[in-house]
């Protein structure tokens, strides 16, 4: 029964069905033949069986509509987004960049052979007071096969802590050091 109700609700798009009546002779003043055509609402006493239609809620528009693709929603801000734009290290002349965007932290990327970086990360446990966090060894994806360098990222509370780290810890010559800022 539920399937029948569902099928009927799909067939009818509104609460009215329009149909042509039977041509009959109606007693009129001129005694002419007329066509009895009328619209009968569902569920009235006109002899039409009531078809149960499901009550449909009006479709609400989503908050973010994509103007280029109307069937797709716009994504909101990404998880790591902030109000600061991305500035490459080469084009950046702002020395107070960490202050300009409060959700950034000073970092160092150590790049080199994966095994050397793993040993270095183990040795860094002696200097825990000189950094905030250290990542595991990671790689960039979708790069050409020529560059097999692994990366370890270290975060710091301040640039002075990062400078103390660089002045204290001996970094192997085969490991390159890149300083910068990261959005946290």
Curated annotation (Swiss-Prot):
Pfam families reported for this sequence: PPV_E2_C
Annotated segments matching region Disordered: 33-74
Gene Ontology BP, a term: regulation of DNA replication
Keyword NADP among record annotations: no
Gene Ontology terms: cellular component: host cell nucleus
UniProt KW Cell inner membrane keyword: no
GO molecular function: DNA binding; DNA-binding transcription factor activity
InterPro entries: E2/EBNA1_C_sf, Nucleotide-bd_a/b_plait_sf, Papillomavirus_E2_C
Predominant subcellular localization, coarse grouping: host cell
Keywords: Host nucleus
Subcellular location: Host nucleus
Function: Plays a role in limiting the replication of viral DNA in keratinocytes. Recruits the host NCoR/SMRT complex to viral replication foci to mediate repression of both viral replication and transcription.
Family (UniProt): Belongs to the papillomaviridae E8^E2C protein family.
Protein's name in the database: Protein E8^E2C
Provenance organism: Human papillomavirus 31
């Amino acid at each position: 029964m539920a399937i029948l109700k569902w099928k009927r609700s799909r067939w009818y798009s509104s609460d009215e069905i329009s149909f042509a009546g039977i041509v009959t002779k109606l007693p009129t003043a001129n005694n002419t033949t007329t066509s009895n055509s009328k619209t009968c609402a569902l569920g009235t006493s006109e002899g039409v069986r009531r078809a149960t239609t499901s009550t449909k809620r009006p479709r609400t528009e989503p908050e973010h509509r994509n103007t280029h693709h109307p069937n797709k929603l716009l994504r909101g801000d990404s998880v790591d987004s902030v109000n600061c734009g991305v500035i490459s290290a080469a084009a950046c002349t702002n020395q107070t960049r960490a202050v300009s965007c409060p959700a950034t932290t000073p970092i160092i990327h150590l790049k080199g052979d994966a095994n050397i970086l793993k040993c270095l990360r183990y040795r860094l446990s002696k200097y825990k007071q000189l950094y905030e966090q250290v990542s595991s060894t990671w790689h960039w994806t979708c790069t050409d096969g020529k560059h097999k360098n692994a990366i370890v990222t270290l975060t710091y509370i301040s640039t002075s802590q990062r400078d103390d780290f660089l002045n204290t810890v001996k970094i192997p010559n085969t490991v390159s050091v890149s300083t910068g800022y990261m959005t946290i």
